[in-house]
Amino acid sequence: MKLSIVIPTYNEKETLPNLIERLYDEIEPLVEELHVVIVDDSSPDGTADLARNLGKKFHKISVIQRPMKMGLGAAYKDGFNHVLEKLDVDLIVQMDADHSHNPSEIAIMIEKIVDYAYIIASRHVPGSSIVGWNARRQMTHSVAGAIARFSAKIDIKDPTSGFRMFKKETLQRVEFDRIHSDGFAFQIEVLYQLKQKDLRGLEVPTTFVNRVEGESKMGGSEILQFIKMCFSYFGKK
């Protein structure tokens, strides 16, 4: 089984080396081939150059460097399209570079995806935990998730999770040109399409650790985009 991991980055020079090392130490032995795709928005801290240097040590690392900060969702679009067009893989993972997602959990995702179109590492199923969030952050996340589930009619407990695995044929059915969100609302738009196509997913427990290094990708414009997207789903089936 061949696996690709798409990782968007913006000022992740401090966190990326450890993540890449863990992926090649812990996940590469489980698969026939491992490809890592870094999508960097021209980070001022030199993340893209660092990723290229890591590629000299760890084989099969591709770096897509974009001209400016263009958003998390746009990064995933570019990363997924790169994988679908240029790489021969069976499974595709999306994850953050900031240590909030545990690479070792990819193993259980590989095991469970056999009977499903996609897997979500969920913060809201038994066995999950969240480390480092205060009450306000917990509330904001819960409200956003509830609004997304209600508006898009998605039967997923953690629709905003950014740690996911897809079968290649699942992503091939996603119409990326119909996804208008460049930010984190992209996560909801993908799930909405998968639901429309009757593709079944599974949520597995995760331990989510709030980022302690690097730079957050969340901004006010992304929140507004999320609200606009949710309103667009009202009235749709």
Which residues fall in each region the model found?
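Cell-envelope/extracellular polymer assembly enzymes that use nucleotide-activated donors
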Residues: 2-4, 35, 189
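Short beta-strand/loop segment that forms part of the nucleotide-sugar
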Residues: 32-43, 64-65
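A conserved acidic beta->alpha catalytic loop
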Residues: 40-49, 68, 99
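Short beta-strand-to-loop acidic/aromatic patch adjacent to the donor-nucleotide binding site
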Residues: 88-100
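Short, well-formed alpha-helical segments that are part of the catalytic scaffolds
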Residues: 12-27
